[in-house]
Amino acid sequence: MLRAAARFGPRLGRRLLSAAATQAVPAPNQQPEVFCNQIFINNEWHDAVSRKTFPTVNPSTGEVICQVAEGDKEDVDKAVKAARAAFQLGSPWRRMDASHRGRLLNRLADLIERDRTYLAALETLDNGKPYVISYLVDLDMVLKCLRYYAGWADKYHGKTIPIDGDFFSYTRHEPVGVCGQIIPWNFPLLMQAWKLGPALATGNVVVMKVAEQTPLTALYVANLIKEAGFPPGVVNIVPGFGPTAGAAIASHEDVDKVAFTGSTEIGRVIQVAAGSSNLKRVTLELGGKSPNIIMSDADMDWAVEQAHFALFFNQGQCCCAGSRTFVQEDIYDEFVERSVARAKSRVVGNPFDSKTEQGPQVDETQFKKILGYINTGKQEGAKLLCGGGIAADRGYFIQPTVFGDVQDGMTIAKEEIFGPVMQILKFKTIEEVVGRANNSTYGLAAAVFTKDLDKANYLSQALQAGTVWVNCYDVFGAQSPFGGYKMSGSGRELGEYGLQAYTEVKTVTVKVPQKNS
């Protein structure tokens, strides 16, 4: 995912992870100490009201890292109460200059950069992604996101409006209020930054639920939020499970907005809960089955490497992964042969090893789910060209897997696998591939590889997706919005568009004695 990763292009694989490319990456502590494993409310650490805990597991070994406080409805209630108090008129947060909010976000980014090596190691320990990627990609994008929104803090404002009559009219961009934020496990630090940046820049307060699979880095950042100087109650972080803590946020009558990144199935549940409670506004960034279209005139070397990257990056655990690779028939055989060779050469192993390209899946549940999809693919007639099995005797490692001769009606071509399983489909004409690509309930992203500008423009307009990449994949920047069509979600994150979901527009009209132009 992400711009920093894509910038390396074909070097992102073996070449990015070579010794030469990693000279600037400090050596990790493979057993980083865990400092924060409780609930963060009002700038203080708390045990769960129930005193319950849950284990967070190292996916490379299957061993428990530590126990974490298990937040539930009562803990969410406490967090919402603290956030609401911090948002009261006259509070330090409400009276703070917008420019000072920006300085606090910049200070938070500085503290994250100070602790970058530790956070990258902790992310790798808890999530399983290669340490080099945690350090060079995820942390890099976290810093850029927070600093980008720090710059917006005093620049997203209303306007004066010349209405008829002796009146003066203007708009204010006001914070929504208490924002519930539920983040996923595939990019824990980055998704935290995507949510916190626009919310805090616009003056909101936050109650965040972190994924139970990967709570540790987000909780450590809570310590840095306090150190940066954010007032108590502005950010509250509750580790816990979706059906309990997550559901409590989505249905809470005193939460004004909820933002969720995760599966379409859970997104539906959250939208229903929001509507049946207080009609809180909702933004959803959900699943995808993104088409990656390789035209016959594409640069073959680049297309093969980018298609590999589009699917296998982050162990295939990307909502926008290029998981339907459509290849024009006259280059299909060569593309498949070269894609299989590239997958076979992919280095799977210890995520702290600088040579590793692919670590484990995040947990046993995902591990078994992906293996189940592989079996389904074989049973339904897709041709297994490489991989398909377990890649280590412990941990949740899966071999890089490629299926050929995939048909649109097969389960693996319709459902989000969220793992290192590439599906390659053949097409004849550009008109055909547009129809097939759009024949999906999802619409998060798409890509096209071609040297023909007319084809690129036609496809970028015809494809039903929130993001279309041309001759690249997973190029992200904090400046560009991201979000989906159809069942891939609603609303946008990042960029100026990402601020809209966190503000209310108020119109103020004043009677004046006499208007002069």
UniProtKB/Swiss-Prot annotation:
The modification N6-acetyllysine is found at K52, K73, K78, K159, K368, K383, K426, K428, K451. SUPFAM superfamilies: ALDH-like (SSF53720). PROSITE patterns: ALDEHYDE_DEHYDR_CYS, ALDEHYDE_DEHYDR_GLU. The active site is at E285 (proton acceptor), C319 (nucleophile). Residues 1-17 form a transit peptide. It is found in: Mitochondrion matrix. In response to mitochondrial stress, the precursor protein is ubiquitinated by the SIFI complex in the cytoplasm before mitochondrial import, leading to its degradation. Within the SIFI complex, UBR4 initiates ubiquitin chain that are further elongated or branched by KCMF1. Keywords: Acetylation, Disease variant, Dwarfism, Intellectual disability, Mitochondrion, NAD, Oxidoreductase, Transit peptide, Ubl conjugation. Its EC number is 1.2.1.3. Pathway: Alcohol metabolism; ethanol degradation; acetate from ethanol: step 2/2. Homotetramer. This is Aldehyde dehydrogenase, mitochondrial. The lineage of its organism: Eukaryota, Metazoa, Chordata, Craniata, Vertebrata.
